[in-house]
Amino acid sequence: MGKTLYQKLFDAHVVYEAEGETPILYINRHLIHEVTSPQAFDGLRVAGRQVRQVNKTFGTMDHSISTQVRDVNLLEGQAKIQVLELDKNCKATGIELFDMNTKQQGIVHVMGPEQGLTLPGMTIVCGDSHTATHGAFGALAFGIGTSEVEHVLATQTLKQARAKNMKVEVRGKVNPGITAKDIVLAIIGKTTMAGGTGHVVEFCGEAIRDLSMEGRMTVCNMAIEFGAKAGLIAPDETTFEYLKDRPHAPKGKDWDDAIEYWKTLKSDDDAQFDTVVVLEAKDIAPQVTWGTNPGQVIAIDQLVPNPAEMSDPVTKTSAEKALAYIGLQANTDLKDVPVDQVFIGSCTNSRIEDLRAAAAVMKGRKKADNVKRVLVVPGSGLVKEQAEKEGLDKIFIAAGAEWRNPGCSMCLGMNDDRLGEWERCASTSNRNFEGRQGRNGRTHLVSPAMAAAAAVFGKFVDIRTIKLN
């Protein structure tokens, strides 16, 4: 019987598998940041252990840093401690660190791919739940906890049980104005936030193949949001073109040999999947979440669902609780709902393609009066540099947005960028949980174009009706 891409990747990295025990996997790439690594390094010191393979671990600063200042001395509290600790630990062990003073610094899941650290066929781990992003390259990538970070630093291996296999096929082509974010939100809406639990999911179909690498990263980034362990897309010419000449990508004959191997990284025709989900691309409309998990999502031309019409008691109770928190009534048209803030950024949507899409909407327009703040936060120093070369920063600033430095920013309430209590935000991030963007903040997940439209019109609008300047 044939193998799935996941099975091929997993089996290729098994170091040891005793009968009846969890397999031990070799880890090709370990990415670290300032939040989940300090305790791991402390554990190494206490145990008297060294970092086993320094050249396979890379660090960056992203979660708790300020997007306004680049000087560690101007940081405060926990953020300053975490940044200084990461710098100290990387210097002590020889780990390469992309710190705040380099243009290579960025959100870990933006920095890794653009540096060529993310390659097809690899196993990649990071102390961050959205490590699945790297699966867009045909790599087996997943988030790990701090104790596992320590284990990988010490051994370059990790115990990992086999997951089930899931295939999500998006057939045909999407309509104009529909983005990768809309595709993945539609998938989560269909599967629910737990639909992929216990699985590694492979995304396929014409609509997935049509996506750029930036779009594929957006899709895999949110695999975790429907419960999957990891997300995968088989590598192809789009992948190879993106990676060619990246700093850490193979060169010369090594590149040719790598391409030959990478072309084998696909599911066999007779591979068996435990779960199969199919969507028709033509049916996908611009998506907006209405509740407090990414599975509570509708198309912009639909009304907020009525919990009274839900037959499952758990789903009904969850919807009632979500609507109470989010401050909406059943059967509300989201196009009538004003927003207080807009956030364009995060490891989901802060790449150059995302910023171009937002700028196309905001060009020649101004922030709506009712919108208190619009944050545009590039995913890395290189994205920022490219955006400024193209003049995108000037478009954002002219529209009344704030153009910031790279970082995780308002995706999570761990730094200075937060919502005020009960403020409503159109956000390009990946989670709309209660309090995710700040105490009692209300988050609606959308694509960059939809977020930009909310910024200039002051409410949610159907991007398909907006003329681009």
Curated annotation (Swiss-Prot):
Pfam families: Aconitase. Keywords: 4Fe-4S, Amino-acid biosynthesis, Branched-chain amino acid biosynthesis, Iron, Iron-sulfur, Leucine biosynthesis, Lyase, Metal-binding. Binds 1 [4Fe-4S] cluster per subunit. It comes from the Bacteria. GO terms for biological process: L-leucine biosynthetic process. Its cofactor is [4Fe-4S] cluster. Pathway: Amino-acid biosynthesis; L-leucine biosynthesis; L-leucine from 3-methyl-2-oxobutanoate: step 2/4. Gene3D superfamilies: Aconitase, domain 3. It catalyses: (2R,3S)-3-isopropylmalate = (2S)-2-isopropylmalate. CDD domains: IPMI. Its EC number is 4.2.1.33. GO terms for molecular function: 3-isopropylmalate dehydratase activity; 4 iron, 4 sulfur cluster binding; metal ion binding. Signal peptide: none annotated. InterPro entries: 3-IsopropMal_deHydase_lsu, Acnase/IPM_dHydase_lsu_aba_1/3, Acoase/IPM_deHydtase_lsu_aba, Aconitase_4Fe-4S_BS, Aconitase_4Fe-4S_dom, IPM_dehydratase_rel_enz, IPMI_cat. [4Fe-4S] cluster binds at residues 347, 408, 411. It is an enzyme of class 4 (lyase). Catalyzes the isomerization between 2-isopropylmalate and 3-isopropylmalate, via the formation of 2-isopropylmaleate. Belongs to the aconitase/IPM isomerase family. LeuC type 1 subfamily. Heterodimer of LeuC and LeuD. This is 3-isopropylmalate dehydratase large subunit. It comes from Actinobacillus succinogenes (strain ATCC 55618 / DSM 22257 / CCUG 43843 / 130Z).
